[in-house]
C-alpha cells in the first residue's frame, strides 16, 4: 500500500479530464441562475441528492448531469471561468500537468463558435496557470510550474437536441445516412481544432472520440483520425468502456490510437462479437501484447469505472488495472469527471494503488 500522504505530496499529471464533468457545483448554480437554466435544485446539497450522486445505478444516470453542465457552458465567459477554476482545483491536489478535453460541437452552433469555444477554454487555463507560474514559490524553485494542453473531442453519435451545431447539421443534410453524418461532424471537429491551434495558438495536443460506444464503431471516424494524423495532432479514443476488446482493436487498427480512454474490457474475450475472431482468447492476448509492446497508453479512471460499469461490482479488486500493470502496459490514472464522480487525482491514484 502506498501512503496517501506520499500520493498527495508528489507532483502529478491528469490527462483524462472532461471540462463539462469537472466544474464546481457552486459555479454551476451561479451560471444557471444568470443564464436562466432550469436546475432540479439550486442548492449544492440538493444537486448532490438529485443529480450528482455518490453512486449511480447505470451509465444513463451518470450522464444525466451533463445536460445541466453543458447548458451553462454556451458562452466564452462561462467556459473561461470554468477552465480557470479547474486549474485552481487541480493545483490544490498537486497536479502539475493536465490535459483538459471537451467537445466544442456540444457547446456551439457553428464551426466558428467551436473555434471560439476552444480559445475561451485556452484563455481560462492560461490565465490560471500564469498566476501559479509567476508565484514566488515557482520563482524560488520550491514548486513546479503548471503545464497544460487541450484535447478536442468529437462524438461517436449525436441526435437532434444535443446541440445547436448538431441540429444545424441535421437540417442541412436531412437525407444523409447517419454514419456519414457523424463522420462529417468528427472530421469538422478536427479541422476546428487545427484552426484554433494555427490561428490563435491554442495548444490542442490531441483528438478524442467520446460518447456511445456500442453500435457506433470508431471506424466510422477514420477520416477524422487521418486528418488529425496529417496535422500532427495526437490520437486517443474512448474504447473498451462499454464494449469488448474488438472496440479497442478498431481504435488502434483503424484510427491509429496512441492512447485508449478507459479500456476496462480489454481482457474480456467473452465480450467479442465479431465472428472473424475465431480464437477469442488468442486474439485478446495478441491485442494486449501489442498494447504493452507499442506503449499504447491506457487512461484508467477508477471511480468513474466503478460507477458506470456494473460488472465491476463497485470493487477495485474486479478492475483490470493491476493486470494491465503486470502485463507491462503504460497506464495513466486520471479523474475523468471530478464533479460527476466526486473525485480528485489523489483519490484515483489511491484506488489504483490498492487494486
Language model: regions and residue ranges:
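Metal-cofactor-binding active-site regions of metalloenzymes
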Residues: 1-233, 241-259, 265-355
Amino acid at each position: 500500500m502506498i501512503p496517501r500522504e506520499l500520493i498527495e505530496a508528489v507532483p502529478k499529471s491528469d490527462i483524462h479530464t472532461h471540462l463539462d464533468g469537472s466544474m464546481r457545483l457552486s459555479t454551476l448554480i451561479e451560471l444557471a441562475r444568470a443564464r436562466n437554466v432550469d436546475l432540479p435544485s439550486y442548492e449544492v446539497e440538493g444537486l448532490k441528492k438529485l443529480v450528482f450522486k455518490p453512486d449511480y445505478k447505470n451509465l444513463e444516470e451518470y450522464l444525466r448531469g451533463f445536460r445541466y453542465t453543458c447548458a451553462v457552458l454556451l458562452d466564452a465567459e462561462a467556459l473561461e471561468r470554468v477552465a480557470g477554476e479547474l486549474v485552481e482545483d487541480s493545483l490544490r491536489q498537486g497536479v502539475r500537468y493536465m490535459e483538459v478535453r471537451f467537445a466544442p460541437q456540444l457547446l456551439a452552433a457553428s464551426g466558428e463558435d467551436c473555434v471560439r469555444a476552444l480559445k475561451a477554454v485556452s484563455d481560462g487555463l492560461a490565465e490560471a496557470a500564469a498566476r501559479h507560474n509567476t508565484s514566488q514559490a515557482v520563482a524560488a524553485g520550491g514548486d513546479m510550474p503548471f503545464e497544460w494542453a487541450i484535447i478536442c473531442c468529437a462524438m461517436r453519435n449525436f441526435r437532434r437536441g444535443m446541440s445547436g451545431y448538431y441540429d444545424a447539421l441535421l437540417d442541412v443534410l436531412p437525407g444523409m445516412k447517419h454514419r456519414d453524418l457523424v463522420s462529417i461532424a468528427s472530421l469538422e471537429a478536427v479541422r476546428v481544432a487545427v484552426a484554433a491551434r494555427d490561428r490563435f495558438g491554442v495548444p490542442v495536443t490531441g483528438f478524442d472520440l467520446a460518447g456511445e460506444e456500442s453500435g457506433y464503431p470508431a471506424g466510422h471516424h477514420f477520416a477524422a483520425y487521418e486528418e488529425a494524423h496529417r496535422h500532427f495532432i495526437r490520437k486517443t479514443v474512448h474504447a473498451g468502456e462499454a464494449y469488448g476488446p474488438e472496440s479497442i482493436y478498431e481504435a488502434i487498427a483503424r484510427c491509429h490510437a496512441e492512447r485508449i480512454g478507459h479500456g476496462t474490457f480489454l481482457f474480456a474475450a467473452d465480450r467479442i462479437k465479431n465472428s472473424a475472431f475465431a480464437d477469442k482468447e488468442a486474439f485478446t492476448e495478441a491485442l494486449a501484447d501489442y498494447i504493452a509492446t507499442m506503449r499504447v497508453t491506457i487512461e484508467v479512471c477508477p471511480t468513474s469505472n466503478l460507477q458506470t460499469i456494473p460488472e465491476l461490482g463497485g470493487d477495485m479488486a474486479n478492475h483490470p488495472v493491476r493486470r494491465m500493470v503486470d502485463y507491462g502496459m503504460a497506464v495513466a490514472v486520471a479523474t475523468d469527471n471530478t464533479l460527476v464522480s466526486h473525485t480528485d487525482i489523489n483519490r484515483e491514484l489511491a484506488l489504483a494503488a490498492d487494486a
